[in-house]
């Protein structure tokens, strides 16, 4: 490639500016009013939207955890247990299910959740040895209870 003049050798900065503006306006297309047409307004709005998007990722996690806890609380109260008692006694019985799985079990598998609540209730009232009973677990649940002989 041969450049005959110095002007052809230098970069054309106008096209860079054009594509930079179009990139911002592309993100602002769905905004209402002048914010999707005027570059100066679009830049502010797009930056603000990106900041809110970043914060919303953490809020979503927090809101989902609150939702799971509310669902587990409601389901455990149907079986006569409070939420802290249910979670604490399931941990003591070495049932390693997180809140998301417990909330899903409470909604879609109520019999399984009922047996988990029964296990936690027995552990609460009688202790770990009584929770194991005769060495069998309640029907319909799987846990990682280690039995020592």
UniProtKB/Swiss-Prot annotation:
Q: Which GO terms describe its cellular component?
A: mitochondrial inner membrane; mitochondrial large ribosomal subunit; mitochondrial ribosome; mitochondrion
Please report which protein family the annotation says this sequence is part of. Answer: Belongs to the bacterial ribosomal protein bL20 family.
What is the protein's given name?
Large ribosomal subunit protein bL20m
Q: Where in the cell is it found?
A: Mitochondrion
Q: Which keywords label this protein?
A: Mitochondrion, Ribonucleoprotein, Ribosomal protein, Transit peptide
Q: Name one Pfam family in it.
A: Ribosomal_L20
Self-association and partners: Component of the mitochondrial large ribosomal subunit (mt-LSU). Mature mammalian 55S mitochondrial ribosomes consist of a small (28S) and a large (39S) subunit. The 28S small subunit contains a 12S ribosomal RNA (12S mt-rRNA) and 30 different proteins. The 39S large subunit contains a 16S rRNA (16S mt-rRNA), a copy of mitochondrial valine transfer RNA (mt-tRNA(Val)), which plays an integral structural role, and 52 different proteins. Interacts with OXA1L.
Q: Which InterPro entries match?
A: Ribosomal_bL20, Ribosomal_protein_bL20_C
Q: Which GO terms describe its molecular function?
A: RNA binding; rRNA binding; structural constituent of ribosome
The answer to whether the entry has keyword ATP-binding is: no
**Which biological processes are named by the entry's GO terms?**
mitochondrial translation
Question: What Gene3D superfamilies does the annotation carry?
Answer: Ribosomal protein L20 (1.10.1900.20)
Coiled coil ranges (UniProt) are: none
Stretch forming the transit peptide: 1-9
């Amino acid at each position: 490639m041969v450049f005959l003049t110095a002007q052809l050798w230098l970069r054309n900065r106008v096209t860079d500016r054009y594509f930079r503006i179009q990139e911002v306006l592309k993100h602002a297309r769905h905004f209402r009013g002048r914010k999707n047409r005027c570059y100066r307004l679009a830049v502010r709005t797009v930056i603000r939207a990106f900041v809110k998007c970043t914060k919303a990722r953490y809020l979503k996690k927090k809101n989902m955890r609150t939702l799971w806890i509310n669902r587990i609380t409601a389901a455990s109260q149907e079986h006569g247990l409070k939420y802290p008692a249910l979670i604490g006694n399931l941990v003591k019985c070495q049932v390693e299910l997180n809140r998301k799985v417990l909330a899903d079990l409470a909604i879609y598998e109520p019999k399984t959740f009922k047996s988990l609540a029964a296990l936690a209730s027995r552990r609460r009232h009688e202790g770990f040895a009584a929770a194991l009973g005769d060495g069998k677990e309640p029907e319909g649940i799987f846990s990682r209870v280690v039995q020592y002989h």
